[in-house]
């Protein structure tokens, strides 16, 4: 960050590559005591963005310039993120698989080398990409052929386990919880609030066990995140008849990512009582929304 600050002081924009903002040519650069400073620790630990709704513009550009969502492309994204003083990224996920398309783990290795902390989107738990299941599922697959924790618990659990074994060695914030395929509700309309809450409680219990077994026995040393997005928020709070996930031991130490309504309107804030939650809170805010 210090080097990028020097770069900023001599006139290099974070968007130098992306918007062709060419730095002005200077015969000499003079930095004085007025340019000196000590950066405080950021008040927000994980700061970043999510490459989403990436087709057609970003996807076509990646294919033309880099042959896909490769590590060569992500090097430019990582540098932009760091120049903006960020450190956390959710990669593109509509048709791509960050830990496969590098090729292989090249993008993940590069992120780790550059100090970028990787996450996956709110519906991609345990370091697995939504698109991966579409490619790997099948009647004879070890992962089964249904994105359904009730009917295919063994297959889904194996899918998550293998993701943690593959990518858990890097610096990540691990998404927990579960939503339906293609970013949809996890259960059908016939399911009750209690059905959904009980399912997620079982999912979280399994995911925490897998993380302890394959990443670190001390869960407090593994950053984890649950996004209270769309229908997940009422599962968190519950109602007068049904206890929600809010005080579940499975969420101890998990960062709770609060969400807007996709149009910039904040849906919820932690109460005074909730602020003591050990995992803290995050914010998932749509700068732009397509769909």
Task: List the model feature ranges, each with a label.
Residues 182-186, 280-291:
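Active-site clefts of carbohydrate-active enzymes
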Residues 47-51, 82, 88-91, 118-122, ...:
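Hydrophobic faces of well-ordered beta-strands that scaffold small-molecule active sites
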Residues 55, 94-96, 122-126, 180-182, ...:
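Active-site-proximal loop/turn and secondary-structure-junction residues that shape catalytic pockets
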Residues 113-138, 142-144, 148-151:
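Acidic/aromatic-lined carbohydrate-recognition and catalytic surfaces
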Residues 1-60, 64-84, 181, 206-209:
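Solvent-exposed alpha-helical segments and adjacent loops
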Residues 20-32, 102-108, 112-113, 140-278:
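Gly/Pro-rich turn-and-neighbor structural signature
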Residues 68-97, 103-106, 110-121, 169, ...:
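Catalytic domains of carbohydrate-active enzymes, especially glycoside hydrolases
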Residues 58-60, 91, 128-129, 185-186, ...:
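Short helix/loop capping segments that flank catalytic or ligand/cofactor-binding pockets
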């Amino acid at each position: 960050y210090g080097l990028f600050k020097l770069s900023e002081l001599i006139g290099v924009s974070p968007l130098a590559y992306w918007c062709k903002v060419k730095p002005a040519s200077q015969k000499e650069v003079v930095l004085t005591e007025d340019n000196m400073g000590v950066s405080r620790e950021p008040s927000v630990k994980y700061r970043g963005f999510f490459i989403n709704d990436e087709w057609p513009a970003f996807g076509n550009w990646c294919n033309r310039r880099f042959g896909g969502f490769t590590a060569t492309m992500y090097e430019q994204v990582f540098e932009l993120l760091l120049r903006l003083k960020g450190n956390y990224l959710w990669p593109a996920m509509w048709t791509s698989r960050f830990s496969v398309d590098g090729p292989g783990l090249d993008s993940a290795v590069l992120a780790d080398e550059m100090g970028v902390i990787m996450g996956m989107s709110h519906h991609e738990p345990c370091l697995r990409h939504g698109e991966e299941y579409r490619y790997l599922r099948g009647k004879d697959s070890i992962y089964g052929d249904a994105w359904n924790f009730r009917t295919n618990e063994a297959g889904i659990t194996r899918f998550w386990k293998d993701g943690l074994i593959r990518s858990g060695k890097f610096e990540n914030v691990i998404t927990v919880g579960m939503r339906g395929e293609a970013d949809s509700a996890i259960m059908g309309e016939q399911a009750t609030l209690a059905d959904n809450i009980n399912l997620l409680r079982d999912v979280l219990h399994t995911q925490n066990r897998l993380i302890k077994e394959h990443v670190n026995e001390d869960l407090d040393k593994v950053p984890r995140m649950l996004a209270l997005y769309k229908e997940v928020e009422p599962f968190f709070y519950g109602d007068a008849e049904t206890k929600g996930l809010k005080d579940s031991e499975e969420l101890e130490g998990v960062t709770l990512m609060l969400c807007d309504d996709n149009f910039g309107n904040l849906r919820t804030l932690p109460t005074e009582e909730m602020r003591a939650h050990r995992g803290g809170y995050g914010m998932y805010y749509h700068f732009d929304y397509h769909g």
